[in-house]
Regions:
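A short secondary-structure junction signal
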Residues: 5-9, 31-35, 60-65, 141
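A short, conserved beta-to-alpha structural element at the edge of catalytic cores
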Residues: 16-40, 139, 143-147
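A glycosyltransferase accessory/donor-loop signature
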Residues: 46-162
């Protein structure tokens, strides 16, 4: 994941009483999938970038709820913690613009199916780039990865010593 812009607006966001804010999963929003958990009928977020209202988490013992959910669902979920989070926060999360968690794997997914118009690569660099799926910039055996040049720009940057 690469952050390319200030997170000031995100960190000062009015969460309107929601315990989490996230971006809808770009692929799962467009395909029908059925698993032992009933999440295919409600919006499902990608947990790679999650904004949490920690006051609410403490007041509502969210950590305990997540642990109980994980214990109950155990191996029955395809996306681990993401499914646990979506189960606990089902219909109780604030949806953010997709640029706050631009999921590169979605571009590849829809291109392979000749459906690029469903999820096109944006013309401008998003504030948060999430290199989803197995296609990672540091693994050279994958084809074209959206915004791979941004990853390498930050990787090769001359960072100050701490």
């Amino acid at each position: 994941m690469v952050v390319t812009q200030s997170l000031h607006d995100l960190l000062n966001l009015d969460m309107r009483g929601y315990p989490v804010a996230a971006v809808q999963d770009s692929v799962l929003a467009h395909i029908e999938w059925k698993y032992p958990i009933d999440l295919h009928t409600t919006p499902y977020f990608n947990s790679g970038m999650l904004l949490a209202d920690l006051v609410q988490w403490r007041e509502h013992n969210i950590a305990v709820q997540l642990l109980k959910t994980a214990a109950c669902l155990n191996e029955a979920v395809p996306y681990g913690n993401q499914c646990f989070l979506n189960t606990v926060f089902q219909k109780n999360w604030l949806q953010l613009e997709e640029s706050w968690n631009f999921q590169t794997g979605a571009v590849e997914y829809f291109q392979k199916r000749n459906l690029s118009e469903v999820f096109p690569k944006p013309d401008t660099v998003p504030p948060v780039i999430h290199y989803t799926t197995r296609a990672k910039p540091w693994l050279c055996d994958y084809g074209e990865i959206p915004f791979i040049e941004v990853y390498w720009q930050y990787y090769c940057a001359d960072w100050p010593k701490a």
